[in-house]
Amino acid sequence: MVQSATEYGILVGVDSSAESDAAVRWAAREASLHDAPITLMHVIAPVVVSWPAGPYMATVLECQEENARHAIEQAQKVVADCLGETHGLTVQTEIRKESVARTLIDASKSAQMVVVGNRGMGALGRVLLGSTSTSLLHYASGPVVVVHGDDQAAHDSRLPVLLGIDGSPASEVATSHAFDEASRRGVDLVALHVWIDVGDIPPIGPTWEEQEETGRALLAERLAGWQERYPDVKVHRRVERAQPAYWLLEEAKQAQLVVVGSHGRGGFTGMLLGSVSSRVAQSATTPVMVVRPR
């Protein structure tokens, strides 16, 4: 079983947007699966002006606080509508007044995972929450889940969990979370290894067949111990020759959750988000869990 922080449980950033509501719905179901608390957090970003603050500033701050209360109340209603009024889940709420990204990154250290919508924050949402999501994917502690609206596949309990494996230490950590998620959902796990990311240029050295065999051996090595720990999870092993991000995005269409490491082959400790993980997190319609180290 995956060890996790417990103060915040499943931490979800809320802001009253439709994308935020979708993230709350996903987080509520996730908290129920883990029997964990859910924390609804709204962060009031500092107001930056290029002229001296006048009497109007008090009105601006009051409006921000009112919006924050509304965002929390709306998120609480979403949880109740999703799980029922008598769900029994511990719902915690918190309003902070700091940098949005910095606050959520700091809070991630005390959370089992952080869940965010792919955009939000009103009219400028794509800029603001887009940058917040990106910052979390680069710097948060532990898993970050990006929810892309109310994708129906995310609610289809029959679909498998998709795991991207590349043999890196980061994908090993992702493997533990993928097995745990599949086990809790009672679904299969598709373990996908894509073994070429340089196009269709014939390699100098091992043949395609040898490369494929190496990929299968890598999958077997990475999965052996985990299959023993989670005998209830049926694993489908897939080895493909293609662009990794493209193939993961294609397979994601038939999955309820995609799990990837924060960076892949050749990554250094502390390296920023890998290009494959970044593209999948940005482009998939299925919820994507990017597992970062703690």
Swiss-Prot record:
InterPro entries: Rossmann-like_a/b/a_fold, Universal_stress_UspA, UspA. One of its GO terms (molecular function) is ATP binding. There is a cross-link at residue 109 (Isoglutamyl lysine isopeptide (Lys-Gln) (interchain with Q-Cter in protein Pup)). The keyword Nucleotide-binding applies. The keyword Secreted does not apply. ATP 2 binds at residues 164, 197, 261-267, 275-277. Gene3D superfamilies: HUPs. It holds the Pfam family Usp. ATP 1 binds at residues 13, 117-123, 131-132. Keywords: ATP-binding, Isopeptide bond, Nucleotide-binding, Ubl conjugation. PANTHER family: STRESS RESPONSE PROTEIN NHAX, UNIVERSAL STRESS PROTEIN UP12. Belongs to the universal stress protein A family. This is Universal stress protein MSMEG_3950/MSMEI_3859. It comes from Mycolicibacterium smegmatis (strain ATCC 700084 / mc(2)155) (Mycobacterium smegmatis). The lineage of its organism: Bacteria, Bacillati, Actinomycetota, Actinomycetes, Mycobacteriales.
